[in-house]
Design a protein with these regions (language model features):
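Primary detection of the long, small/polar-rich alpha-helical "axial" segments characteristic
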Residues: 1, 5-191
């Protein structure tokens, strides 16, 4: 039916939006891991000022890249990672109330706590490592929540496919039975 295909399309759109956000967060996660490597490297007092400045420059560029990812990750013209994709409902069934809520937190460098990190000294690099680990935890938690939603949607889609197939099969059997009954009646009446 048209309603079932509309629901199916909305479910597929939900999966697609989640996959777009998850892909972007995967990249953010990789950037944070690189930032952690750099902070660990900077936490070594054998570094010269030139070394630490080079590390700081890369840290700043990586933080800016997190912000770029946050501001450019969209699905159907909607920003996914700027905090505005919150409390969104996805209709997953043909009836009212059959929906799943999706919320994605703001994933910019400031919101996850890695904006303006300094690695200019042993102690600031150590502090940066702590903040980066916390950011990794925030991103991982959001990714886990999205993964759970995606699994739920995929199970719902499989169930909708199953219900649709079983309904079609039942309708076919009913039509076949009706046709057989009509043939018997026709034969009886024409003898």
């Amino acid at each position: 039916s048209s309603a079932a295909s509309d629901v199916y399309k909305r479910q597929q759109d939900g999966v697609s939006a989640i996959q777009v956000a998850e892909g972007a967060l995967n990249e953010t996660h990789s950037i944070l891991q690189r930032m952690n490597e750099l902070a660990t490297q900077a936490a070594n007092d054998t570094n010269t000022t030139i070394d630490r400045n080079a590390i700081q420059s890369e840290m700043d560029a990586l933080s800016s890249e997190i912000d770029r990812i946050r501001s450019t990750t969209q699905f159907n013209t909607q920003n996914l990672l700027d905090g505005s994709f919150s409390g969104k409902n996805l209709q997953i069934g043909a009836l009212s109330g059959q929906n799943i809520a999706i919320s994605i937190s703001n994933m910019d460098s400031s919101s996850i706590g890695v904006s303006g990190l300094s690695v200019s000294s042993f102690s600031s690099a150590g502090s940066a490592m702590t903040k980066i680990q916390s950011a990794i935890d925030i991103v991982s938690t959001q990714r886990s929540a999205l993964g759970a939603l995606q699994n739920r949607l995929e199970h719902t889609i499989s169930n909708l496919d199953n219900v649709s197939e079983n309904t079609s099969s039942a309708e076919s059997r009913i039509r076949d039975t009706d046709m057989a009954d009509e043939m018997v009646n026709y034969s009886k009446n024409n003898i």
